[in-house]
């Protein structure tokens, strides 16, 4: 069953069970591209924005209190996820996001009119009052992006930090051989090594918390080209204040609306911090899977949890699947960063028209990293253990312990000891005594792996 909707281009039929209008229907038909829906976080952010703008318009005497209340009630339904099925549009549409703005406007008007009566609330004249897609979409981008970071990504970073802190303490005195250039180096403790991973997360969280302040200023109030045409001079300030009350986030009105409409450097900047986190997560996951390689023919210093059979042909095989998933996510995030960077450069004159693809990739990065960090923590990190016998054997066999002799006999003599031990396949101690450069007593005194860690 269908109904007839009308816009400036004429009549068009719409599924009678759906709440969208003519412009949404035209977009749905004209942009049958891919299967990537506009992120629901953007729809919810739009609803928060439309509720705030309705309140401000009512306070300014432009919109009746009755209409503002009705608009706000529908916005609450949207935010609570009750109307998700009525937002069918894909990311691949106009670069200003106009169709999604109108999708929200039309749904709000339609649902509100079910109560107030047909035609009482107009999607453009009432719901979109004092606004343009050009300032509402970038505002929704910032609302959605900031909320996703606060509610999804930052909590997962903190939880992974806590697990690494526990592992660090547990293994702080377990001496292992260090490795630089993928070759044996001087010893450190496993706890010290893990502390480096923990610091990766701590520092990246700090980078993110600092950079995300860049998306607190909002474009709302700029309307079409940044001049604020058809909006009051302080409309942006009032809406930002109302959004702060709604969300608890310290949003402000951007001081330069021309910048806010044409540049997406704030989101580009914040995603740079997300990419940095992805880079370090790839490093951590790679370290763990290499240290867990084996179990008999690899490094084998770490043991990863057995979550599932590793091979369809090799019985008993355990693979570092969580590490692999994490590194694939990291690679995807790095790719998203390239897309965002290119798209952010396309602010031609007064408007960037790559907005949907920017926020789509941003929110995908946040979701993928949040989900993969949770999975990695629960199914890998928490069950990660040290293979202490293997670690001890590798420390005792390492030739790089000879570095501790440098202050006592000099670099060249120490190098000769290491070379002799390697050439004759003997222990470092046997080679040192054979050269006559040190006595057994001196060797035992000077070669203490734990002391070499400066713990």
From Swiss-Prot:
Stored Pfam families: FumaraseC_C, Lyase_1
Domain of life: Bacteria
Entry binding sites for substrate: 96-98, 122-125, 132-134, 180, 312, 317-319
InterPro entries tied to this protein: Fum_hydII (IPR005677), Fumarase/histidase_N (IPR024083), Fumarase_C_C (IPR018951), Fumarate_lyase_CS (IPR020557), Fumarate_lyase_fam (IPR000362), Fumarate_lyase_N (IPR022761), L-Aspartase-like (IPR008948)
Site (Important for catalytic activity): 324
Keywords per UniProt: Cytoplasm, Lyase, Tricarboxylic acid cycle
GO biological process terms on file: fumarate metabolic process; malate metabolic process; tricarboxylic acid cycle
Active site: 181 (proton donor/acceptor), 311
An MF annotation (GO) of this entry: fumarate hydratase activity
Catalysed conversion reaction: (S)-malate = fumarate + H2O
Keyword Nucleus: no
UniProt keyword Cytoplasm present: yes
GO cellular component: cytoplasm
Miscellaneous notes: There are 2 substrate-binding sites: the catalytic A site, and the non-catalytic B site that may play a role in the transfer of substrate or product between the active site and the solvent. Alternatively, the B site may bind allosteric effectors.
The protein's role, per its UniProt record: Involved in the TCA cycle. Catalyzes the stereospecific interconversion of fumarate to L-malate.
Subunit field text: Homotetramer.
Family, per entry: Belongs to the class-II fumarase/aspartase family. Fumarase subfamily.
Protein name as annotated: Fumarate hydratase class II
Species: Listeria monocytogenes serotype 4b (strain F2365)
């Amino acid at each position: 069953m269908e109904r007839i909707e009308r816009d400036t281009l004429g009549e068009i039929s719409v599924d009678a069970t759906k709440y969208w209008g003519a412009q949404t229907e035209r977009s749905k038909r004209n942009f049958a591209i891919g299967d990537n829906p506009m992120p629901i976080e953007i729809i919810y952010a739009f609803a928060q924005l439309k509720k705030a703008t309705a309140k401000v318009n009512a306070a300014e005497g432009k919109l009746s209190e009755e209409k503002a209340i009705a608009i706000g009630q529908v916005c609450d339904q949207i935010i609570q996820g009750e109307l998700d099925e009525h937002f069918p549009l894909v990311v691949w549409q106009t670069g200003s996001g106009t169709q999604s703005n109108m999708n929200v406007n039309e749904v709000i008007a339609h649902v509100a009119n079910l109560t107030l009566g047909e035609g009482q609330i107009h999607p453009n004249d009432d719901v979109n009052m004092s606004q343009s897609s050009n300032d509402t979409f970038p505002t929704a981008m910032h609302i959605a992006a900031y909320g996703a970071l606060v509610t999804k990504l930052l909590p997962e970073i903190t939880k992974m930090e806590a697990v690494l802190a526990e592992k660090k303490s547990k293994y702080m005195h377990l001496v292992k051989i260090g490795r630089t250039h993928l070759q044996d180096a001087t010893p450190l403790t496993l706890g010290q090594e893990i502390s480096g991973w923990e610091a990766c997360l701590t520092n990246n969280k700090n980078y993110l918390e600092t950079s995300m302040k860049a998306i607190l200023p909002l474009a709302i109030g700029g309307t079409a080209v940044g001049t604020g045409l058809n909006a009051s001079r302080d409309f942006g300030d009032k809406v930002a204040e109302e959004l702060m009350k709604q969300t608890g986030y310290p949003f402000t009105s951007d001081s330069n609306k021309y910048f806010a409409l044409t540049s997406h450097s704030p989101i580009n900047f914040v995603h740079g911090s997300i990419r940095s986190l992805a880079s370090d997560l790839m490093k951590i996951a790679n370290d763990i899977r290499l240290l867990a390689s084996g179990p008999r023919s690899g490094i084998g210093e770490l043991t990863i949890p057995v979550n599932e059979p590793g091979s369809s042909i090799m019985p008993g095989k355990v693979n570092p699947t969580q590490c692999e998933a994490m590194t694939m996510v990291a690679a995807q995030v790095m790719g998203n960063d390239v897309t965002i960077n290119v798209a952010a450069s396309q602010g031609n004159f007064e408007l960037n028209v790559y907005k949907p693809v920017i926020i789509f990739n941003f929110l995908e990065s946040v979701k993928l990293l949040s989900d993969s960090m949770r999975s990695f923590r629960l199914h890998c990190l928490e069950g990660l253990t040290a293979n202490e016998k293997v670690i001890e054997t590798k420390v005792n066999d390492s030739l790089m312990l000879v570095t501790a002799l440098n202050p006592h006999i000099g670099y060249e003599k120490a190098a000769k000891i290491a070379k002799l031990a390697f050439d004759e396949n003997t222990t470092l101690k046997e080679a040192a005594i054979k050269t006559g450069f040190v006595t057994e007593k001196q060797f035992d005194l000077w070669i203490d792996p734990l002391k070499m860690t400066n713990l």
